[in-house]
Curated annotation (Swiss-Prot):
Belongs to the protein phosphatase inhibitor 2 family. This is Protein phosphatase inhibitor 2. Residues 1-261 are annotated as: Disordered. GO terms for molecular function: protein phosphatase binding; protein phosphatase inhibitor activity. Pfam families: IPP-2. It comes from Dictyostelium discoideum.
Amino acid sequence: MNKDEEFLEEHHYKDDDAIEGEEEQGEEEESDLDDDMYNIDGETNDDDDDDEAEDEESSEDEKQNQKFLYKKKRNLTKSSSNGEFKIIPYSTLKGNTPTKGILKNKSQPPPKKNRIVWDEENLTINDMNKSSTMKIDEPKTPYHYYESEEETDESKKYLENKFLELQNALDKQQEKSEWDSDNDEQQQEKEKEKDKKKKKKNLKIHMRSDSDDNDDNEDEDEDETEEKKENKKKFDNLRKAHYNEFKVVRDLNANLSDDEQ
């Protein structure tokens, strides 16, 4: 450091000490004036004395605190001027730091990013309404298998006959082993005969069911009343008369020719 700088610092600190002394003298004079104001005509009270003693103690504590802070500031300025590193106490740093309102609060949640958000309540409701197997409340549509008399590749009779042919061919290809006996052959023949009889019975039952359906239709026709039959005949005659346009035109031409003659 230069001599000029050292001189300025010493002079600055001397001025600060002089200012402190003057402030202390001014405070003492003010306290004396207060005492004179309260002690008029030589009257004094013990309570006032106690209050004054407490005020003096508090004022002395405040003065000591102010001096302590002032010395700390002066030491800090000295360390900064000398360029030396000095540890700063935590209390001074805490006093100089700003309030927490400027800083981020840890209690606040982090900002939300633009992501897909599923409506979980709606999903749970849909899962509750759904069932493992969807039930159909509508009535079943009647399905009648159409059996054509012609034996095509898709007809039922053709497929049954084809299946029987293949089964017979497989039975013939099976070779007889040494362990097979005559009794086994007889049992196989009996089983084949039983199968044939069952198939014949099924065919007869099927034919009977078809004939029964036709009989039912005939019975329904017979149950119709005579009034319905008469109404039907009238309707048929009116429909024929309405759609037989050729006859109507011919009759009109005949009438015109008669009028001209």
